[in-house]
């Protein structure tokens, strides 16, 4: 293998690992949920007024959007490449996080965290692993996939 290609593969793998690290925001839901539940229980003006039984709904919507969003994200990654797909994912996750930072409404969190963040994560994941794997021979793809998603 050419040294320039090997170096490029390492850079892409490091970038893909960084993307996946950032996409771990999905798994921070329990922190958000605890803060929302505390706000509901305190009943402070301007705080969250959700029904406690619906606290997991934004996470569930995010997981569904993540799963089903992989289909168009994969098609975009195949057609336009990982840069465009990763950028779309980053913009969606960023927009969702900005949106939820400015609202306490249940619908706002369903759209912001559920739809935007969930779909953005799908686009990010679909860009990262395939891009890294393409730079290595077939006998290394399992190792590289493991490094990227670890």
Model-derived regions, located:
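Pair of pore-lining "gating" transmembrane helices in MFS-fold secondary transporters
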Residues: 6-28
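Extracellular/periplasmic helix-loop-helix junction of adjacent transmembrane segments
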Residues: 31-68
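Small-residue-mediated transmembrane helix hinge/kink sites in multi-pass secondary transporters
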Residues: 34, 71-75, 130
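Intracellular juxtamembrane helix-capping segments at the cytosolic ends
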Residues: 36, 114, 123-137, 144
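Loop-to-transmembrane helix entry/capping segments in MFS-fold secondary transporters
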Residues: 52-53, 138-148
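Conserved MFS/SLC helix-loop-helix module at the cytosolic interface between two early adjacent transmembrane helices
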Residues: 68-107
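Hydrophobic core of transmembrane alpha-helices in multi-pass small-molecule transporters
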Residues: 96, 107-123
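Hydrophobic alpha-helical segments of secondary membrane carriers
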Residues: 113, 147-150
């Amino acid at each position: 293998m050419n040294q320039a290609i090997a170096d490029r593969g390492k850079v892409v793998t490091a970038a893909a690992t960084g993307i996946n690290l950032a996409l771990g925001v999905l798994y921070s839901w329990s922190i958000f949920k605890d803060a929302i539940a505390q706000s509901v229980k305190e009943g402070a003006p301007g705080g969250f007024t959700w029904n406690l039984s619906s606290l997991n709904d934004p996470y569930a919507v995010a997981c569904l959007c993540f799963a089903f969003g992989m289909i168009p994200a994969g098609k975009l990654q195949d057609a336009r490449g990982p840069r465009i797909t990763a950028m779309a994912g980053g913009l969606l996750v960023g927009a969702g996080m900005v949106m939820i930072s400015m609202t306490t409404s249940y619908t706002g969190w369903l759209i912001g965290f559920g739809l935007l963040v969930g779909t953005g994560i799908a686009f990010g994941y679909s860009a990262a692993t395939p891009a890294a794997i393409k730079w290595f021979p077939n006998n290394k793809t399992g190792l590289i996939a493991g490094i990227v998603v670890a």
